[in-house]
């Protein structure tokens, strides 16, 4: 075994195993020390990685060397086996004339193995006899006779017999006997049990026959490695049997204590049971023995705890609870504490309710508070007196946008910024103008929410969300409602606006109706036909063309109808590659108007040519309304829908037959000078855009169309407004308005 490792490696291994030099060769003891040191030096247990690697390297080299030595072992038999008087398990050495024991028992003995052992025994110093000095007890019962068939055991060979520990006290009842071997090769004659040798003076001589060989740990280790086995399992089994036989007189060890695998049930409700979580905490509790908790109480100062305390349970187990100013992972805290707990158990968990846990420990009789760095934990240390911060109500702002059909985020933001002002000093609320109804009707309700909105950092996001909410509700309504219902809802809102107008304003809008009556004698029938086409929306029978010279009233009438039904105006005179986003404006609209479309001039040299008519000719599937088309806006996904019906206004351009066939109604406009003169005489109609107002179209319907033609849901309001109009202006007054217009005078002249 000494030839397997060098002297330096041997000393290093003994140092790493914390083993005394005299136990070198005691494989069982060395293996036990190796396992113990593995627990201490393993990196996962907080040990030194370099020392662990060095220990593993030396231990592996030792085991491999022992294995190779065993492979070289083999039996040697007595040349006169039939006449040999040696006991079983002993063999004759022809070079020295001595005997030695064996216990490996392997069959076959090669020349190479024989040569190895000849070199090994040549180093023995056989000139000096092996002796053992000891005094036997006077009692005859204490003498142990030689057994004729002792169990085979290897001879312990020592280079210095005087340095052996024969003078020490050892148990006398050892079951293993050794026979002394003389240099002449003949064993001593065994002494009989009742036979003793005496000195001439009557003294007792030292018996030099069978003696009890002291079994010190050092001799035990030498004896162990003096014999070789066929396998590692036999070696370990022999070691365990040998150790047990030499410790029969020692008291039995108490049964090992079972370490707890979890915290007590009373504390589990205050702890975090997450195992694989990386969440950081600032309160922890450690469960270990009382002695280790006292050590850990001092070691956790590394975390600068604001509070730490030891709680004792059952006088043997304890807990260390501590709270840190910073946050740490449970695994990191446990790994640090495990460095100080090589044998003792240790459990570590995060505390989710530190105050409740402390109160539970303080009140429970099973626990005792051993020490603390400060006198306890109190409720005020965990309570922050924070003022309740009010936040803006997003839903309330959204309801304001939905009620007033505001789909522009900037408009919503502007209203709410004005709502934040004091209501008593608000001019809009003081004037209470009908066109400012959105403001003065909602100022008082949204004042408090608007003040919070004023200091909010997410104003644009809130308004954008409200606008999206309006668009979402509108799209859903378009999908679920019929076009008759949509038109009725639109007229209902206009009736509410008409109700708020003053009599003077109503006279002004009634003059606009008279203005259109002078443009087309059957204006009411024309308006009803257009509304019918838009409402029924029959493919290829839904589009209208307004065609005529400049300043004939095409754009004014088209704009008034679009405002009545809730449509938009589009420009198709742009290049074809820009049409997609222009057409996307028509998403979810009731109708559209292609305003002032240009085309080929033909014989009209005074007109400018353009791409509008050519682009419309390429949009036949849009105009027909037979199939769904893809409409898109910037930053919005494409949407497939039937393109809404349209009104096309154009001058006297050439229309190809493929495009002209898409219009179900064509109205030719003419220039009437008196219409322009009457508008010049009444500046109010121009400034307030009476001719383009939806209220003008609504009053035209109320004035000319019977109540039965309106939707049932509108009849009550229609009858009320009809009565108001008839009381305010009779047919004679209306006829005078028409006469004034035809004369080119102010429609309200002398009225």
From Swiss-Prot:
This is Large T antigen. Isoform large T antigen is a key early protein essential for both driving viral replication and inducing cellular transformation. Plays a role in viral genome replication by driving entry of quiescent cells into the cell cycle and by autoregulating the synthesis of viral early mRNA. Displays highly oncogenic activities by corrupting the host cellular checkpoint mechanisms that guard cell division and the transcription, replication, and repair of DNA. Participates in the modulation of cellular gene expression preceeding viral DNA replication. It comes from Hamster polyomavirus (HaPyV). One of its GO terms (molecular function) is zinc ion binding. The lineage of its organism: Viruses, Monodnaviria, Shotokuvirae, Cossaviricota, Papovaviricetes. Residues 133-260 are annotated as: Disordered. ATP binds at residues 548-555. It catalyses: Couples ATP hydrolysis with the unwinding of duplex DNA by translocating in the 3'-5' direction; ATP + H2O = ADP + phosphate + H(+). A motif (Nuclear localization signal) lies at residues 251-257. A zinc finger (T-ag D1-type) spans 389-483. Keywords: Acetylation, ATP-binding, DNA replication, DNA-binding, Early protein, G1/S host cell cycle checkpoint dysregulation by virus, Helicase, Host nucleus, Host-virus interaction, Hydrolase, Inhibition of host innate immune response by virus, Inhibition of host interferon signaling pathway by virus, Inhibition of host JAK1 by virus, Interferon antiviral system evasion, Isomerase, Magnesium, Metal-binding, Modulation of host cell cycle by virus, Nucleotide-binding, Oncogene, Phosphoprotein, Viral immunoevasion, Zinc, Zinc-finger. Residues 155-165 have a biased composition (Low complexity). InterPro entries: DnaJ_domain (IPR001623), Helicase_SF3_DNA-vir (IPR014015), J_dom_sf (IPR036869), Lg_T_Ag_polyomavir (IPR016392), Lg_T_Ag_Polyomavir_C (IPR010932), P-loop_NTPase (IPR027417), T_Ag_DNA-bd (IPR003133), Znf_lg_T-Ag_D1-typ (IPR017910).
């Amino acid at each position: 075994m000494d030839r397997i490792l060098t002297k330096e490696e041997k000393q290093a291994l003994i140092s790493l195993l914390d083993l005394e030099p005299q136990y070198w060769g005691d494989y069982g003891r060395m293996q036990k020390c190796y396992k113990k040191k593995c627990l201490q030096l393993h990196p996962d247990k907080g040990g030194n990685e370099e020392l662990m690697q060095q220990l593993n390297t030396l231990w592996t080299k030792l085991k491999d060397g022992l294995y190779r030595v065993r492979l070289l072992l083999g039996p040697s038999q007595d040349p006169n086996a039939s006449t040999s008087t040696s006991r079983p398990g002993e063999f004759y050495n022809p070079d020295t004339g001595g005997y030695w024991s064996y216990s490996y028992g392997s069959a076959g003995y090669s020349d190479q193995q024989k040569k190895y052992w000849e070199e090994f025994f040549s180093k023995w110093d056989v000139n000096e006899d092996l002796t053992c000095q000891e005094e036997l007890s006077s009692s005859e019962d204490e003498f142990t006779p030689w057994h004729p068939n002792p169990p085979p055991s290897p001879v312990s060979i020592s280079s210095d017999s005087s340095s052996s520990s024969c003078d020490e006290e050892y148990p006398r009842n050892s079951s293993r006997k050794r026979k002394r071997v003389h240099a002449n090769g003949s064993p001593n004659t065994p002494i009989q049990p009742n036979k003793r040798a005496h000195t001439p003076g009557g003294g007792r001589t030292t018996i030099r026959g069978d003696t009890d060989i002291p079994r010190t740990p050092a001799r035990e280790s030498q004896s162990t490695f003096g014999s070789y086995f066929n396998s590692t399992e036999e070696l370990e089994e022999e070691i365990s049997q040998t150790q047990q036989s030499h410790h029969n007189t020692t008291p039995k060890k108490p049964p090992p204590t079972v370490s707890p695998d979890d915290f007590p049930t009373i504390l589990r409700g205050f702890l975090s049971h997450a195992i694989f979580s990386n969440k950081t905490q600032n309160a922890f509790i450690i469960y270990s023995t009382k002695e280790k908790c006292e050590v850990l109480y001092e070691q956790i100062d590394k975390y600068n705890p604001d509070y730490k305390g030891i709680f004792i349970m059952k006088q043997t187990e304890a807990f260390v609870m501590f709270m840190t100013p910073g946050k740490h992972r449970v695994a990191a805290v446990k790994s640090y504490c495990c460095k100080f707990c090589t044998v003792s158990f240790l459990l570590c968990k995060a505390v989710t309710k530190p105050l409740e846990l402390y109160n539970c420990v303080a009140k429970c009789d099973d626990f005792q508070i051993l020490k603390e760095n400060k006198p306890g934990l109190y409720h005020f240390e965990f309570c922050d007196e924070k003022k309740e911060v009010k936040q803006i109500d997003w839903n309330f702002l959204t309801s304001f946008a939905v009620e007033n059909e505001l789909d522009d985020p900037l408009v919503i933001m502007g209203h709410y910024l004005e709502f934040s002002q004091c209501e008593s000093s608000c001019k809009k609320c003081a004037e209470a103008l009908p066109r400012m109804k959105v403001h003065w009707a909602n100022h008082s309700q949204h004042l408090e929410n608007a003040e919070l909105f004023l200091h909010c950092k997410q104003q644009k996001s809130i308004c954008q969300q409200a606008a999206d909410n309006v668009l979402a509700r509108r799209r859903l309504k378009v999908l679920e409602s019929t076009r008759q219902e949509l038109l009725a809802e639109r007229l209902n809102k206009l009736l509410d606006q008409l109700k708020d107008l003053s009599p003077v304003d109503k006279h002004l809008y009634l003059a606009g109706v008279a203005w259109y009556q002078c443009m087309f004698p059957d204006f009411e029938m024309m308006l009803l036909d257009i509304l019918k086409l838009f409402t029924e929306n029959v493919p290829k029978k839904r589009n209208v063309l307004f065609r005529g010279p400049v300043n004939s009233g095409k754009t004014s009438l088209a704009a008034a109808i679009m405002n009545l039904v809730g449509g938009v105006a589009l420009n198709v005179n742009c290049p074809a590659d820009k049409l997609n986003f222009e057409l996307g404006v028509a998403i979810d609209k009731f109708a559209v108007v292609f305003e002032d479309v240009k085309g080929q001039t033909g014989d009209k040299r005074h007109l400018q040519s353009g791409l509008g008519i050519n682009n419309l000719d390429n949009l036949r599937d849009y105009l027909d309304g037979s199939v769904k088309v893809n409409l898109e806006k910037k930053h919005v996904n494409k949407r497939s829908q039937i393109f809404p019906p349209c009104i096309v206004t154009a001058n006297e351009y050439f229309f190809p037959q493929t495009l002209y066939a898409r219009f179900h109604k064509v109205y030719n406009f003419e220039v009437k000078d008196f219409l322009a003169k009457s508008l010049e005489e009444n500046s109010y109609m121009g400034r307030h855009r009476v001719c383009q107002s939806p209220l003008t179209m609504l009053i035209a319907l109320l004035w000319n169309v019977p109540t039965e033609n309106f939707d049932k849901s509108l009849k009550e309001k229609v009858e009320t407004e009809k009565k108001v109009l008839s009381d305010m202006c009779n047919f004679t007054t209306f006829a005078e308005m028409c006469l004034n217009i035809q004369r080119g005078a102010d429609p309200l002249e002398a009225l």
